[in-house]
């Protein structure tokens, strides 16, 4: 995972000593106190490249293909049903997707023993870094860089939306990059079908990238929520600062209205709740800022597209297809090179009655599909 050519190195602290287990079919590694037990085809050095609430991610090499991969360990994956559903959802979704701008799942490591199946290891194609790291770095970003990132993000999102899926958690750290500046959407654990209109209680998407309709608990949200997030990401990539770093819901809405102006009554039609409409009307009123003055270092085309994404009323927000046709992206846009998903994704496996044990069995079956040769 050498990104020195474009992005600089993050150091190389690795774990190369493993202990063979289960007759040599698996190897255990200790990575900063974290136990990693993987199929023997994944060979060291194992290098930690990421960490989150779910666990840790290590880079390794698949000795059978010579390919470098990223292995995410989700420890005690079935202790919490919401987290377990999220893991299952991501596995199913990414298996369904096949697009240059969506991260690919290469393997779900089959556990040595079904009865002791508690940790899930998902193997992805390896990327060098993510957009959050690049924004925070000293790496110079030109308008062409930003345009290329945005184009790839929208190209991937067009495919995702065509599969009848909303990502719902787009943010710079979920946009993975390699040294060629290729971009891929990652982390589909919060994704939902477009037809699901219930407000998800476990919704934890980072507040800074959350659309107004979600901040206002609008239950019937659409693909427009992802476009709002794309606008936030575009602005942040250009300015190297988050557009709306709200401390809480109220502060978040205030930051939004300070930039795009307080909505008038005609922009509140998407709110079904009288209480929500009343709440918005009693908020402090702000005039719309001049975007060109607010973003002096952005090209006129980028500013115009940003204005069309950051629209309070989701029904008036630009769509992914319209955004791809915007003049700012004309140097890159080619509708024949922007494929859609052939089959819509089916979320029917997510029954309300699913138990932790059901989810464990469904994920176990996925490990067997990836590793049929290991099954008796």
UniProtKB/Swiss-Prot annotation:
Q: What is the effect of changing residue 115 to Q?
A: In strain: cv. C24, cv. Lz-0, cv. Wei-0, cv. Yo-0
Location relative to the cell = Cytoplasm; Nucleus; Cytoplasm, Cytoskeleton
Top-rank taxon: Eukaryota
Q: Which residues bind ATP?
A: 49-57, 72
GO CC annotations on file: cell plate; cytoplasm; microtubule; nucleus
| Effect of loss of the gene | Dwarf plants with cytokinetic defects in leaf epidermal cells. Abnormally developed and branched root hairs. Retarded root growth with the protrusion of many epidermal cells from roots. Heavily bundled and disoriented cortical microtubules resistant to oryzalin. Exhibits a seedling-lethality phenotype. Defects in the formation of the cell plate. Abnormal mature pollen grains. Abolished CO(2)-mediated stomatal closure.
State whether it acts alone or in a complex, and with which partners, per the record.
Answer: Interacts with MEKK1, MKK1, MKK2 and MKK6. May form a ternary complex composed of MEKK1 and MKK1/MKK2 and MPK4. Interacts with MKS1 and AP2C1. May form a ternary or larger complex with MKS1 and WRKY25 and/or WRKY33. Interacts with MAP65-1. No interactions with RACK1A, RACK1B or RACK1C. Interacts directly with ASR3 and mediates its phosphorylation. Binds to MEKK2. Interacts with PAT1. Binds to HT1.
How are the domains described in the entry? The TXY motif contains the threonine and tyrosine residues whose phosphorylation activates the MAP kinases.
Q: What is the recorded name of this protein?
A: Mitogen-activated protein kinase 4
Q: Which organism is it from?
A: Arabidopsis thaliana (Mouse-ear cress)
């Amino acid at each position: 995972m050498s990104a020195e050519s474009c992005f600089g190195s993050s150091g190389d602290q690795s774990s190369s000593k493993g202990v063979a287990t289960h007759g040599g079919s698996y190897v255990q590694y200790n990575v900063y106190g974290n136990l990693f037990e993987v199929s023997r085809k994944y060979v060291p050095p194992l290098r930690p490249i990421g960490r989150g609430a779910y666990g840790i991610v290590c880079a390794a090499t698949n000795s059978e293909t010579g390919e470098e991969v990223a292995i995410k360990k989700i420890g005690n994956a079935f202790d919490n049903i919401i987290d377990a559903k999220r893991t299952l959802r991501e596995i199913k979704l990414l298996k369904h997707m096949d697009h240059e701008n969506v991260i690919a799942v290469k393997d779900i490591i089959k556990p040595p023993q079904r009865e002791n199946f508690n940790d899930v290891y998902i193997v992805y194609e390896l990327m060098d870094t993510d957009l959050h790291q690049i924004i925070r770095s000293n790496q110079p970003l030109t308008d062409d860089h930003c345009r290329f990132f945005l184009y790839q993000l929208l190209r991937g999102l067009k495919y995702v939306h065509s599969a009848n899926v909303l990502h719902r958690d787009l943010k710079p750290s979920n946009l993975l990059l390699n040294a060629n500046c290729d971009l891929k959407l990652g982390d589909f654990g919060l994704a939902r079908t477009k037809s699901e209109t219930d407000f998800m209680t476990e919704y934890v998407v980072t507040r800074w990238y959350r659309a107004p309709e979600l901040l206002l608990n609008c239950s019937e949200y659409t693909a427009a929520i992802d476009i709002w997030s794309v606008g936030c990401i575009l602005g942040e990539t250009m300015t190297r600062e988050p557009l709306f770093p709200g401390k809480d819901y109220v502060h978040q809405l205030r930051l939004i209205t300070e930039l795009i102006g307080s909505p008038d009554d005609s922009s509140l039609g998407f709110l079904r709740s009288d209480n929500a409409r009343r709440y918005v009307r009693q908020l402090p009123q702000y005039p719309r800022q001049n975007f060109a003055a607010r973003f002096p270092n952005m090209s006129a085309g980028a500013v115009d597209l940003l204005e069309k994404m950051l629209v309070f009323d989701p029904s008036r927000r630009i769509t992914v297809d319209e955004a791809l046709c915007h003049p700012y992206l004309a140097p890159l846009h080619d509708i024949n090179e922007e494929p859609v998903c052939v089959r819509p994704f089916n979320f029917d496996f997510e029954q309300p009655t699913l138990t932790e044990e059901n989810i464990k069995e469904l994920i176990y079956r996925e490990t067997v599909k990836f590793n049929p040769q290991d099954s008796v």
